[in-house]
Amino acid sequence: MAERKFFGTDGIRGLVGEGPITPEFVLKLGWAAGRVLSQQGTKKVLIGKDTRISGYMLESALEAGLAAAGLQQFTGPMPTPAVAYLTRTFRAEAGIVISASHNPYYDNGIKFFSSEGTKLPDAIELAIEAEMEKPLTCVESAMLGKAYRINDAAGRYIEFCKGTFPSQYDLSEYKIVVDCAHGATYHIAPNVFRELGAEVITIGCEPNGININDQVGATDVRALQAKVLEEKADFGIALDGDGDRVIMVDNEGNKVDGDQIAYIVARDALRRGELKGGVVGTLMTNLGMEVALKNLGIPFVRSKVGDRYVMEELQKHNWLIGAENSGHVILLDKITTGDGIVAGLQVMASIVGSKMTLKELSDGMTLFPQVLENIRFKGEGNPLESDAVIAAQKAVEAKLGDTGRVLLRKSGTEPLIRVMVEGENADLVQQYALEIAQAVKDNC
């Protein structure tokens, strides 16, 4: 297969104003995507965006390109999972999201969903890239596309989310803190939980275009932890900027990550006799999850890092539950992509159904100490091929033996080298991670 030039593991992403996230590029991308998608079936696409200030500029450019290719567009501010869901209900040929997910406001990106609400196949992404090499042309005036606003997009998605929560349950006995990262779920998630009966306290629900993911949300739960303790809430839930990640916090302020959420959902499905197959994690998934699932007799496999690879393994095994510890939780019996609100609701259903607290549920899985170091580099060359870095990794692996793991990889979405070390002794794990990280820094 040819190598993709622009598309990464989660669409096209970068710093706004620099290639490829410029109005010129996005206009051409919209045109090329429109040309390719119009050959697949209906000439209709859905567009959603998060709360970044640059989203308005990029949306206009994308709409112009799609219109030049003759595609009709249905638009509205909505989370990534809502785009995946509504693409199917609108019978659109594709869904397009303008977002950089958990990244800061000065980044943005474009990602596509197929008509089935799943990530676009590699072949379609390659076809779009090939089309971009051609000169931009315009369909005849009578064939030009047009953009339409979906006025009830939020309401449609709220009802969908509520529909994934068991009808015999409600949340009337629970106080919940909801952190929306000043992102796309700010006008949706609080209403979902309120309409199910919960007492809801909100943080991260005042977007201004530049505060998305800023010390709030799934990538930084310190504010949520403090608010849960201050309000004496039963638990808290944090979403990221585009709503496809979720991290929870128990009543004692402990973080409950994507691994633990998947474990809770799988164990509850097993308790109800409804578990189909096993669970897919990634190379970053904590060893504690693997051990806990094994003790329950639940099969477990690892994929490469990235929700698209988790999805590939789920489809390969015909399983339903997959997750990344960063908070991407995929529940294929509910929706075709990672959905923070829906995943959180399934944990809440387990809390209500088992009459256990979030802490009691998550305590069934003991996390191994794990340290992740992120080293920024210019993106040139590959520090991971350095003899010094390879030697440092091998030295740590020899010390850990069978009691831990080391993983070094390039980020698929940012110019970062990620160093992960996991083992039984927290102090040693921290020391080993810093040793390898220093070797990487010395060779960047």
UniProtKB/Swiss-Prot annotation:
UniProt keywords, alphabetically: Isomerase, Magnesium, Metal-binding, Phosphoprotein
GO molecular function per UniProt: magnesium ion binding; phosphoglucosamine mutase activity; phosphomannomutase activity
Entry annotated with the keyword Protein biosynthesis: no
Record SUPFAM superfamilies: Phosphoglucomutase, C-terminal domain, Phosphoglucomutase, first 3 domains
Reactions it catalyzes: alpha-D-glucosamine 1-phosphate = D-glucosamine 6-phosphate
UniProt-listed GO biological process terms: carbohydrate metabolic process; peptidoglycan biosynthetic process; UDP-N-acetylglucosamine biosynthetic process
Isomerase as UniProt keyword: yes
Pfam families: PGM_PMM_I, PGM_PMM_II, PGM_PMM_III, PGM_PMM_IV
Cofactor note: Binds 1 Mg(2+) ion per subunit.
Annotated positions binding Mg(2+): 101, 240, 242, 244
Cellular component per GO, a single term: cytosol
Modification after translation (UniProt): Activated by phosphorylation.
Reported function: Catalyzes the conversion of glucosamine-6-phosphate to glucosamine-1-phosphate.
Protein name per the record: Phosphoglucosamine mutase
Organism: Photobacterium profundum (strain SS9)
Gene that encodes the chain: glmM
